[in-house]
């Protein structure tokens, strides 16, 4: 005899409750690699419009961190979405492989850079970089990121280097490249110039001093011997002082105290008198700044004078209104000093940051060490009025984390002024996905100075410039193209082992070299010029990519980095931005919003998370945060994400178990929308709204909205209502009954569409779900397409069932109270009576068959008021009377001798 439990159509699936992700994910990765999934995706989409997300190259040094993981996963969401939604989207990952950090690693590991030829050291750098690429590539692939991993672009690749110097050549042709002596960021710790993008600001303690420069001019404007008081926080730059700047329109006041005469901005006198401890002072004459022009003051410790000059940048916010001017150590100082005043440029500091002979008695001292000795000398000579220490934001080398200086050295520059308006126009034409993105980049380009592109290092792409015998730099694009062809064949190392003649075209002559001798530039290019030309070295060079790219997506720090350098080089050569759209991500912080650091012990490693929880959890976390802002991650946050994942997985398991337990075949059993039961139509209508929203969110890269929308549907509409309601139909009704097939059609619609919509995000789990859908054709879910929008316009149906579900909420409240009062246990023990004074509600209730199934109770009557009033209805719950059916557990008036209600008896008799 068949047991009744065996007559129920219970869920059955091989899809396990536990994800076991750390063990399962490597199996999927192996499978995808063996089937060459990436190529198959591209083949499937051949002929479709191209969509190119161009990868900003991470630096090839060290393990990937959680910020790298977020970056690559966000890109993977987009590439997979585009490939499932009507595009062919090639994704070529890249690596930034030159630069100082790699040099430093080798030096720290005992490699003596100065004891070997440059070529040998460069080869060691290359070997190290390539090993780092292999290591990072393995880690990125573990995250489930799809792409052309076997053919990445590397900035050390000879073809990339050739394209890079071709960009340089085109910029030379347009007059955008020049060599000049200017104050630049200089890192003594790295012994190299730095670009703005290589600077970070940190708190730094500096001396704050007020110094008197004694007037030596005798023209009567101000009394001879008056001390012009300046303020500075960089005493080490005083040996480079050549001038004192005043504002032409400010009033300057003579102040007599203790037998000395001082000059200060009139507006600053009272504040400074208090600072200097002047109790009894007299005010002398007042003069305008422009009357002081060209006066000469004696330098406080060097045998020369400093010229008083006029400058509009002088302010009264701080200081004395008289500004220490060292054209070799400040941009404003340089500009005003090189104008009509011709002050010259003095920068008595060497590459290591030590003062030179031009600094007099302080020669040989490191700049920051010299501060205290200079201050002591000023105090001894009476030139020092006040000294204190201040903590302020100060630029540091972003790699060594040590303070940098402004220093004038001969450098190669890209002139921004030459095409700034074109750059700003290109920013205007770019689509941004955050309100602040456009003004941020626009203002940076508007306000930035010329770009110093030379570096005094070895590991990088050489600046392809030759010098004639007379010292003239030969800027000639035909020569640069000649070198580019050599680089293409032999790599840039050739620059370091061949002499200039071997690199020049045979028989080349130049008026500046009557003897036919030439030398090479030995500076290399800023690594931002490397990555900033990837639009040519990768996108324009590859047949499967396009220039400009559709999208660049990187961290928000790249507005001053890669977004910026790429824009400059691209507009310089073509007049257009290298990207049509820009998306930026915030930084990853710990659970309390603090930066991650090993010293704080708050670092979350993606490799560790992958081993413990699975990469899928990192992917879900990436899709659950608003990545456009700074985001947080911690072990507690990952536990919450894991719980969310568990619920998603359980929903998929329930759907699979009911659809594919042997009772349903989606190839033959699906019903059309018109054939569905009314409530099932309502669920399809609701779900299609979710699908439409999700598609819109994908189009705008709003991944946290995608997961929120789908998870809410799973938790609220499905788990809390529809699946609970449906158990009576799915388990109890006849296998091929209209009601059951109607509901299974809905479940299949939800499963087949939601698993596709989640495939770009939960790539491993979606594949596992798809494996358990037996009648699908594709080899992988990633070879299927997204569902199309299919909004159903049936406002009356939607309004009706929205209202009925509100009544259901009232019934659930009454059932919960009855449980608490021990009237009932399970809801099937309840008989429910409903009354409403809203005629619309009464009519709605009376229009629905089998209300007891909707409310998951044994019986429902709509009658006069006699219960607890809720929002829409009055509900009375009593314990149902009668007999419990042994199969469906509903309580009914009569059961047969086998304990079955009429419905179950009828089903089994069939």
Question: PLM features: what roles do these ranges have?
Answer:
Residues 239, 243-244, 250-322, 331-335:
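Protease-associated
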Residues 514, 889-892, 905:
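Cys/His-coordinated zinc-binding microdomains
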Residues 43-104, 164, 230-232, 236, ...:
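N-terminal catalytic cores of NTP/NDP-binding nucleotidyl/phosphoryl-transfer enzymes
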Residues 2-14, 18-21, 27, 31-35, ...:
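Residue patterns forming the tRNA-binding/recognition surfaces of aminoacyl-tRNA synthetases
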Residues 96, 184, 188, 194-200, ...:
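Acidic, turn-prone loop/beta-hairpin segments
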Residues 172-199, 272-283, 292, 484-513:
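Amphipathic alpha-helical
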Residues 45, 49-55, 66-70, 74, ...:
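Secondary-structure capping and boundary motifs in well-ordered enzyme cores
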